[in-house]
Amino acid sequence: MRADLIKQRPDVVKAWMNAELDAQLFLADPKNADEIIKMAKAETTGFSDRALWYSLYGTYPASEGGTKTRVNLHYAITPEARGLIDKATAFLFSIKSINVEKLRPEAVMPEFADAVLKERGMKAPIGDVNAMPDSMAPK
């Protein structure tokens, strides 16, 4: 989000963060799988419902890299997420893709997501998208 918007419209920041949390909670609920696939299909072309379903919910053998958890929904900047940001920043600097070794402090502002979570009595990570049995896949 742009710094000027953050400074000028904290109400928009809060609304945006609440909408993002609602979206991630919706995604984490397996009861919404059919609706998620419908939304994805409406935004893409050339993919069957089954292919879209498998991309998010499909079960794959461990020998092929399959895991129970398909997507971790951190929502906020957890210690794990912070570590990934720091690692990515160091890598991008090492290949001269960016010109700073560390991001400036205001580049990552966890306070907004943290405030929304506190207001809702929640903690990050907020959920996961887990693999589902093949029997639940669209035909």
Segments predicted by a language model, with ranges:
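Secondary-structure end/capping motifs
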Residues: 9-100
